[in-house]
Amino acid sequence: MNEARVAIVTGAGSGIGRATALRLARDGYSVVVNDLNAERAEAVAATIRAGGGSAIGVVGDVSSESDVVALVRCTEQAFGPCTLLVNNAGFAHQVPFIELAPADFDRIFAVHVRGTYLCSRAVLGSMLAKGHGVIVNVASQLGQIGGVELVHYSSAKAAVIGMTKALAREVSAHGVRVNAVAPGPINTPLVASLSESWRRAKAEQLPLGRFGEPEEVAATIAFLASSEASLFVGQTLGPNSGDVML
């Protein structure tokens, strides 16, 4: 009997996380929809179930070790061990560096970096024991090139890219693949929260001439989760409308 495919998607109540949860459900995964907002998490899970898929919503803060432990416990009780983790939870806000409060800097790192660490650590034991598993971290192109008034966010996403590479080197020989995506401007609530002037100017700069859609990033994540990406280890793919070419 084939092992059940079980995905945890953090920050899946909206945007890229929501699109990823829906895509993975269509691909045959049982999906655990994590979000800080209970209504959003359950709404996404209900949409998946209405389409014939299997899903539950689990509220939790990825920067909290106890919440992450509970998230993995709920996953295993509902569907079995996690075989795919998508570390997507995150947020951003623009602020000049000189005005960036230490508490805001720490919170960005707590969610993006500590959260990625805690969730990866929580599922890795079962993946290593079985000799297979996939982790996909959602970074950002700003982790590669930086962003004005986004020093805290850019630094955290750079750390996520570094963690992706280091962990991939450590566990790939044991059957666990770790990769990342670094989206450019995507039509999500997070990007909508940035200034209109920035969004307008950015759209004009893109070689493709448009922002991406969450579903396009979800397709990249689904590819990295698939057997077709078996040679991708420690890589950071850039669905970014041509904004960054590496």
List PLM regions with ranges.
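Conserved glycine-rich cofactor-binding loop
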Residues: G13-G15
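Substrate-binding pocket helix/loop in short-chain dehydrogenase/reductase
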Residues: P96-F97, D104-F109, V191, K202
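Active-site helix of classical SDR
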Residues: S120, A156, T164
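Alpha-helical segment proximal to the catalytic Tyr-Lys
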Residues: G125, R169-A173, S230
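Residue(s) in the substrate-gating loop at a strand-loop-helix junction
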Residues: S140
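Short C-terminal tail/terminal secondary-structure segment
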Residues: I145, A222, V233-L246
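A conserved structural motif in NAD(P)-dependent oxidoreductases
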Residues: L206-V217, E228
